[in-house]
């Protein structure tokens, strides 16, 4: 299992790149840390690694799904994204599903570097914006996105169709 930073006193350079198949272990390490951070059911690392390996190899998307941040060769953060074609304004958007920085790498510029990497990708591909959500209780994340210039859109409501709803809808 790749190590994750317990504490970064001098983060040095933050290296960001799109995840590759050989990053499955690093991605799994962050997914497990993210589940613990958000007080979700803890993930089994080997299962997370197998799933990450599948995501990074078999699905072969038209765009990358995960950006990973490394500091001193250690995995420090991730961004999980999807590209959407909304239609109404004929402009593609990137949806930032998750931005997670390992506890020991927080407040070291890793999150900013990840979002900067995504912004550069968007500009290079003609993608007009990044949409994202965060928990309303996550004051640190809200301050972070405010500092980046993110606009809050109160007219939007976040909804989810969980597994049971999917099954019910699919049967009708």
Predicted regions and their residues:
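Active-site acidic-Proline motif in GNAT/NAT acetyltransferases
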Residues: 102-104, 108, 136-137
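Helix-loop element at the rim of GNAT/NAT acetyltransferase active sites that forms part
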Residues: 29-43, 87
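A short beta-loop-alpha structural element at the N-terminal edge
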Residues: 15-29, 40
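Conserved active-site alpha-helix within GNAT-family acetyltransferase domains
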Residues: 112, 116, 136-155
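Conserved beta-strand-loop-alpha-helix junction that forms the acyl-donor binding cleft
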Residues: 132-141, 160-163
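Conserved acyl-CoA
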Residues: 102, 113-129, 151
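Active-site rim helix/loop that mediates acceptor-substrate recognition in acyltransferases
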Residues: 44-66
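Conserved beta-strand in the GNAT
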Residues: 68, 74-83, 95, 100
């Amino acid at each position: 299992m790749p190590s994750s930073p317990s504490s970064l006193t001098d983060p040095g350079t933050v290296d960001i790149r799109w995840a590759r198949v050989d990053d499955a272990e690093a991605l799994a390490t962050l997914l497990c840390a993210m589940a613990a951070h958000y007080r979700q059911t803890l993930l089994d690392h080997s299962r997370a690694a197998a799933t990450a390996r599948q995501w990074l190899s078999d699905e072969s998307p038209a765009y990358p799904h995960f950006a990973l941040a490394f500091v001193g060769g250690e995995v420090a953060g991730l961004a999980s994204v999807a590209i959407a074609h909304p239609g109404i304004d004929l402009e593609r958007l990137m949806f930032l599903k998750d931005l997670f920085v390992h506890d020991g790498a927080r407040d070291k510029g890793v999150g900013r570097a990840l979002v900067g990497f995504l912004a550069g990708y968007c500009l290079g591909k003609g993608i007009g914006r990044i949409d994202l959500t965060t928990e309303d209780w996550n004051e640190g994340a809200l301050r972070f996105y405010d500092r980046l210039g993110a606009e809050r859109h109160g007219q939007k409501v976040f909804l989810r169709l969980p597994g049971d709803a999917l099954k019910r809808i699919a049967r009708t």
